[in-house]
Structures are given as structure tokens and as C-alpha cells.
């Protein structure tokens, strides 16, 4: 998910019963540079359901349990400044965490890229990943992660050889 989509989640968007997150809105910045919740996402294809993994589920449960009241009914909200959390805030916080841990930071969007890379490496079909990422078409996914697919060429040939030997 994009950071703006995560920051715009409402409790009803997290469907623990069916194990999905309904992505329906995002955080945008107005002409006055203030963040606000925008119904809809970056693209039409951004409106989607993303499955909740077993590892993510307990964190979402905790976020829902700890949620306080706020004017926008968001799962993640800046209660200290009484405002919507924007991507710049998340980037600053992420860079601070990386600095404290003495690891290089490439911005929080790198987490999305790493997630997609690990999905590809684990064998998740590109057409499924396209939907999870909210890409308009498969070419966006394939073009963005070309380097990952190229690294998997030899593995694919080895799989094919094993299959052919069994036939």
C-alpha cells in the first residue's frame, strides 16, 4: 500500500473477519499545504482489497484496540498535533529510526518496493501483485520490477528443467 493509503485507513476499512483491507481513500495535501483525507486513491485501480497477512494481523488488531477518537475517525492519527498524518511526517520518522539503527534510509516508499520484491521472489504471480499494489496494468508492475524478474531467470530455467525431467 502507498503511505497515503495507510494513513487514510478508517476502522471499517480493516476487515479482520474476511482478512482484507479495503483501500478506499488516501491522504492528499491542499493548496494551503495541509493534509486532508481524500475519498478515492491515486488511480482508479488503487481502489482495491489487499489481503491481511498473518504477520500483519496482530499489529492491525493492536492499532484498532488503541485507537482514540479523532475528527476523521482514522486508524492512524497525530493526537499530539491533532492532525492527519502526512507522508512527510512518516518519512521524517522513518529516517530517524534508520539513523538511530545506523542503517541507510531510502525513504518509506522503499518499504513498498521491498515488499513487492519479496513477493516476486516468493513466487507470487505478477498479476496478483499488480492488484495488491494498485497498478493500472501489468506492464507497470513488470517494468518497475524488471531487475527482480531478470535475477530470477536462472531459477526459472532450473524449475523448467526439473519439470521436463519428470514428464
Model-derived regions, located:
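Residue-level detector of conserved, well-ordered beta-strand and adjacent loop positions
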Residues: 24, 53, 77-79, 146
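Short, basic (Lys/Arg/His-rich) helix/loop patches that form interaction surfaces
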Residues: 50, 66-74, 79-84, 88-135, ...
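C-terminal secondary-structure termini that scaffold catalytic or DNA-interacting sites
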Residues: 13, 18, 29-31, 36-47, ...
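Catalytic-site neighborhood detector that most strongly recognizes the C-terminal catalytic loop/helix
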Residues: 27, 133-158
Amino acid at each position: 500500500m502507498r503511505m497515503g493509503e495507510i494513513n487514510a485507513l478508517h476502522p471499517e476499512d480493516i476487515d479482520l473477519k474476511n482478512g482484507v483491507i479495503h483501500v478506499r481513500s488516501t491522504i492528499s495535501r491542499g493548496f494551503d499545504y495541509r493534509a486532508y483525507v481524500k475519498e478515492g486513491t491515486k488511480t482508479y485501480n488503487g481502489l482495491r482489497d489487499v489481503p491481511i497477512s498473518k504477520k500483519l494481523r496482530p499489529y492491525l488488531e493492536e492499532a484498532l484496540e488503541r485507537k482514540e477518537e479523532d475528527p476523521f475517525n482514522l486508524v492512524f492519527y497525530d493526537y499530539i498535533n491533532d492532525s492527519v498524518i502526512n507522508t512527510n511526517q512518516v518519512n521524517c520518522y522513518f529516517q530517524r529510526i534508520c539513523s538511530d539503527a545506523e542503517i541507510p534510509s531510502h525513504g518509506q516508499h522503499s518499504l513498498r518496493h521491498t515488499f513487492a520484491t519479496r513477493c516476486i521472489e516468493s513466487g507470487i504471480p505478477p498479476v496478483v501483485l499488480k492488484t495488491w499494489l494498485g497498478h493500472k496494468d501489468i506492464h507497470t508492475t513488470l517494468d518497475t520490477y524488471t531487475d527482480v524478474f531478470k535475477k530470477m531467470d536462472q531459477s526459472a530455467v532450473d524449475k523448467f528443467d526439473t519439470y521436463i525431467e519428470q514428464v
